Amino acid sequence: MAGDLWLVGDCTNHGGLSDAIIVSPDYRLLPEATGADIFDDVEAFWNWLHTSLPSLAQSYSWQAQPDLTRILCVGQSGGGSMAVHSALLHPEYSIKVIVSLYAPLYHNVPNLTVPRPRRILGTMPPPPRKAEGLIRSYIKQSKGSVRTGGNPFDMWELLLCLLQQGRLISLMNIKPDSRLDTPFLLRQVGKLPPLWLIHGEDDSVVGPSTICVHRVIF
């Protein structure tokens, strides 16, 4: 699952694996969409995967046929969060393994919610007043539009502003939705498939406090 904090990237960002079929969902991105919109799109993907992919592969006589009993769900950044949530929301799909790379799994941390000037990947965002202006201007200009991909270089300044101003999670939660609450989902389901979490200790974009391993998983 493509990620980049639900803001940039697209479904073509994954390389190949031998002896595997790679299926990557395309979903709407922030800030044009909300977290609820993104989850609706991912829900539609899983429904399509289980109802349409097998017949599609058969009708086109693919050399490799999908085996939906052996699903490996991999995602980076926002996509890693979606991979974990997919297993929590759909235990009936029997996802076998999850790989989550530098994903924000726990949102209620100062790193994502409290505005503060900080260096991100060696770059200082614009000053707070200017950053807020850039965010509001982009949201106003893009109102009503739909975006499912974005060039990281084109969106980089906006991402810096959103991170510095602590606005990313508030944009995700414009439409309240229990599907966004990782701890709540895990308490409901009670377990996850085997999970490989990868996160850098010095990650300046999504700090390790967002990974929630000790808060939620253990």
Curated annotation (Swiss-Prot):
Probable carboxylesterase; part of the gene cluster that mediates the biosynthesis of squalestatin S1 (SQS1, also known as zaragozic acid A), a heavily oxidized fungal polyketide that offers potent cholesterol lowering activity by targeting squalene synthase (SS). SQS1 is composed of a 2,8-dioxobicyclic[3.2.1]octane-3,4,5-tricarboxyclic acid core that is connected to two lipophilic polyketide arms. The lineage of its organism: Eukaryota, Fungi, Dikarya, Ascomycota, Pezizomycotina. Belongs to the 'GDXG' lipolytic enzyme family. Pathway: Secondary metabolite biosynthesis. Its EC number is 3.1.1.1. This is Probable carboxylesterase clz11. InterPro entries: AB_hydrolase_3 (IPR013094), AB_hydrolase_fold (IPR029058), Carboxylest/Gibb_receptor (IPR050466). A motif (Involved in the stabilization of the negatively charged intermediate by the formation of the oxyanion hole) lies at residues 7-9. SUPFAM superfamilies: alpha/beta-Hydrolases (SSF53474). Keywords: Hydrolase. It catalyses: a carboxylic ester + H2O = an alcohol + a carboxylate + H(+). It comes from the Eukaryota. It comes from Cochliobolus lunatus. Pfam families: Abhydrolase_3 (PF07859).
